[in-house]
Regions:
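Compositionally biased terminal segments of proteins
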Residues: 1-97
Length: 97
């Protein structure tokens, strides 16, 4: 899985769950034609407790690292959590707003 495939999967999931979001960082810069090397994707998103089940279902533990406990803490404290695709080394940082 490459960064664009992972980004597509993330945004399709966020759209399906009704989570508003903003792609930022190097991936956003590349979309505007600024070449960058990156192994992570940064997204600011309005994730709420009601979205946790959908996120866990969309990114199964046999393919991704995603911690329910860390998501809950990130929502409670307005922090960030990661969705990691170990076989590709790609990481998505979700910054909770």
């Amino acid at each position: 899985m490459g960064p664009y495939e992972l980004l597509q999967r993330i945004v399709e999931t966020l759209d399906r769950l009704g989570i508003s979001y903003l792609v930022t960082g190097s991936v956003a810069a590349m979309a505007y034609g600024e070449p960058r090397l990156t192994n992570d994707i940064d997204i600011v998103a309005a994730v709420e407790e009601r979205h946790i089940g959908g996120l866990l279902a969309a990114f199964p533990l046999d393919e991704f690292y995603l911690s329910e406990e860390i998501i809950r803490e990130a929502i409670r404290r307005r922090l960030q959590f990661n969705i990691i695709h170990p076989s590709s080394g790609l990481k998505v940082e979700i910054i909770v707003r």
